[in-house]
Amino acid sequence: MPKYEIMLVVDGSIEESKATAVANDLKSILKKSTDLKLEKMGLKDLAYPINKKSRGYYYLFNFYNEDPASIQEFRRVTLLKKEVLRHLIINLEKDYGYKAKTNPKKIVRSQFRAERYKRIKEQVLAEQEKIRKERDNTPVKLTDV
């Protein structure tokens, strides 16, 4: 069963109770989901203005869902609601970092790259040490001082 995470930003100029009501309305769309958690992250400043708004209420949904139609419905409703400034829906099991950690072919490739990086780093350090020793062994002329 795919695990999803949704970040929701609701307009910060409305009252907190209305923002919570918007989040709860959207939560009701996901009623077929299991292990549904709604975390309120509070009122925060936005990194840049969105629709001339500089603050927003952040909400985080975590849940498991088998029905992709409910995800599409959630997306459709958030686009229609004027109070919702932004939303981001992430399927955590399709996350490429997760796949890279579990795919054996990618694990072997990353180990090879790490070993190659280590060898190159050792060679560079050896060359730098050799140059430093040569510099220390050269005689100093009195005219150089």
From Swiss-Prot:
Q: Which Gene3D superfamilies match?
A: 3.30.70.60
Give the UniProt keywords, A-Z: Ribonucleoprotein, Ribosomal protein, RNA-binding, rRNA-binding
- CDD domains xref list: bS6
Q: Name one Pfam family in it.
A: Ribosomal_S6
Gene Ontology biological process terms, A to Z: translation
Which PROSITE patterns does this UniProt record tie to the protein? RIBOSOMAL_S6 (PS01048)
Citing just one GO molecular function, the answer is: structural constituent of ribosome
Which terms in the GO cellular component ontology are assigned? cytoplasm; ribonucleoprotein complex; ribosome
RNA-binding found in the keyword field: yes
Note the NCBIfam families from the entry: S6 (TIGR00166)
Q: Which family does it belong to?
A: Belongs to the bacterial ribosomal protein bS6 family.
Chain's role:
Binds together with bS18 to 16S ribosomal RNA.
User: In its UniProt entry, what is this protein called?
Assistant: Small ribosomal subunit protein bS6
